[in-house]
Amino acid sequence: MAIHLYKTSTPSTRNGAVDRKVKSNPRNNLIYGQHRCGKGRNARGIITAGHRGGGHKRLYRKIDFRRNEKDIYGRIVTIEYDPNRNAYICLIHYGDGEKRYILHPRGAIIGDTIVSGTEVPISMGNALPLTDMPLGTAIHNIEITLGKGGQLARAAGAVAKLIAKEGKSATLRLPSGEVRLISKNCLATVGQVGNVGVNQKSLGRAGSKCWLGKRPVVRGVVMNPVDHPHGGGEGRAPIGRKRPMTPWGYPALGKRSRKKKRYSDRFILRRRK
């Protein structure tokens, strides 16, 4: 991804750094409208996920995470921007006339061919079961449940690694550092998700952040005591607690929040970093 810097004519362009322009011209049969309700509220109207609301209207692109067009070669026709994720998407024209969107693999260009199946080449963008991949393969869009579609390593720049195969399971090292067991029959896509340099982007101004549906973040230490455990005090005061707390009084910043005795604990060999 090429980072573009604007001329320093205004404060927003002086501080902004965006990626190259990738146009979005979605097909009508692969998009549908969605009503973004809630804005971080639950059924009672209470904020459960903060700093959400507003944002530009979006059309959802239907992405083929299952890759169930077996043994039919497809050609990459376009590489498009998707407002619903930080990775780019590719429009694929298959040999039988089917047209679908997939996540853009890093390095894929218009005109490349891809295929899904059991006995397909180990090349970028191809989808096949883990049992048919050699050890050390870089993969993304990984299934957890067979036939449900890819659920792991789908963000921009994400990549997992196949490190072992034993019995009915394969061992993967995920982008978070977690080492996990997954069925060898589950599908995954070879390669890394594109748009690797997305973390180098700088929006440059608060308005660009609002377009993404993200509202301003206020520190708890500048609030009143009624609003946050860190609030109150005369002037600039410390938080007055042994450790940082959430707005609801629970430990924050480093406290493990995963529930104990989950069914999936048996598949996790090493927790994420």
From Swiss-Prot:
Residues 264-273 have a biased composition (Basic and acidic residues). Pfam families: Ribosomal_L2, Ribosomal_L2_C. Keywords: Chloroplast, Plastid, Ribonucleoprotein, Ribosomal protein. One of its GO terms (biological process) is mitochondrial translation. GO terms for cellular component: chloroplast; mitochondrial large ribosomal subunit. It is found in: Plastid, Chloroplast. PROSITE patterns: RIBOSOMAL_L2 (PS00467). It comes from the Eukaryota. Gene3D superfamilies: 2.30.30.30, Nucleic acid-binding proteins, Ribosomal protein L2, domain 3. GO terms for molecular function: rRNA binding; structural constituent of ribosome; transferase activity. The keyword Chloroplast applies. NCBIfam families: rplB_bact. HAMAP family: Ribosomal_uL2_B. Part of the 50S ribosomal subunit. This is Large ribosomal subunit protein uL2c. It comes from Lemna minor. The gene is rpl2.
